[in-house]
Amino acid sequence: MSQHQARKRFGQHFLTDESVIDAIVRAIAPARDDAIVEIGPGLSALTAPLIARLNRLSVVEIDRDLAARLRKKYPPEQLSVVEADALTVDFRQFGAGMRVVGNLPYNISSPLLFHLMGAADLVRDQHFMLQREVIDRMVAEPRSADYGRLSVMLQSRYRMEKLFDVPPEAFDPPPRVVSAVVRMVPLGPDRPQPASEAAFEAVVARAFSQRRKMLRRGLGDWAAHVPWDDIGVPPTARAEEVGVAQFIRLTDALLAAGVIKA
């Protein structure tokens, strides 16, 4: 097959370092009967070792040339290829117990992480390579510089662990940033949950739109309806100081007051 040229519009950086590939596969620890979905298989760096360990693998690939290569390289009983933009794919189609993996395109990483939350109740775990700075934001704690909307939203749904860094030279072409690998395990149904996920997202987004301001100012006219003492949040707190459980209580208080709708 002819050499594939990486396409900027798809954010393509192909993983080539065998030691990194091996470390990722060991972190995933696939079992023969696992239902694994790989996003962005590219030139099969992860696909090949995964297929060697699985009965069957599903992949989502936006690049039609790469999708055609995959179909030519692997028989359909080994590999199912969904040729589509991952942001448009309904991941619920893959069923309960799925494990999602991939070297995610850095230009759509945050929207894709939010998109995948819609199938989190069916997911066993997720292993992704992303920009290190994105993973640092994902796992950040309150009162840290990296803590923000992404931290709160993902931590409300997953237990996350940064596994290891990956240098630019592990890719072709090399990205301009250091990458890292993260493990995401969905929290169970007994996790703290807001009365409305949509309202929770709206409150968190509004709070972090002015992260340096005191929360009562950042929330605008909503602030007057918040029982600050009851929810355990000082009215002088900034969004970057408020934990996930506190944001959930804040959301439920605003819903109860009729300030926002479910």
From Swiss-Prot:
Compartments, record wording: Cytoplasm
GO cellular component: cytosol
Catalysis performed (reactions): adenosine(1518)/adenosine(1519) in 16S rRNA + 4 S-adenosyl-L-methionine = N(6)-dimethyladenosine(1518)/N(6)-dimethyladenosine(1519) in 16S rRNA + 4 S-adenosyl-L-homocysteine + 4 H(+)
Binding annotation for S-adenosyl-L-methionine: 13, 15, 40, 61, 85, 103
UniProt cross-references to Pfam families, sorted A to Z: RrnaAD
Keywords assigned: Cytoplasm, Methyltransferase, RNA-binding, rRNA processing, S-adenosyl-L-methionine, Transferase
A GO MF label: RNA binding
EC number of the protein: 2.1.1.182
InterPro entries tied to this protein: KsgA/Erm, rRNA_Ade_diMease-like_C, rRNA_Ade_Mease_Trfase_CS, rRNA_Ade_methylase_Trfase_N, rRNA_adenine_dimethylase, SAM-dependent_MTases_sf
Family: Belongs to the class I-like SAM-binding methyltransferase superfamily. rRNA adenine N(6)-methyltransferase family. RsmA subfamily.
PANTHER family: DIMETHYLADENOSINE TRANSFERASE, DIMETHYLADENOSINE TRANSFERASE-RELATED
Job of this protein: Specifically dimethylates two adjacent adenosines (A1518 and A1519) in the loop of a conserved hairpin near the 3'-end of 16S rRNA in the 30S particle. May play a critical role in biogenesis of 30S subunits.
Name assigned to this protein: Ribosomal RNA small subunit methyltransferase A
Source species of the chain: Bordetella avium (strain 197N)
Native organism taxonomy: Bacteria, Pseudomonadati, Pseudomonadota, Betaproteobacteria, Burkholderiales
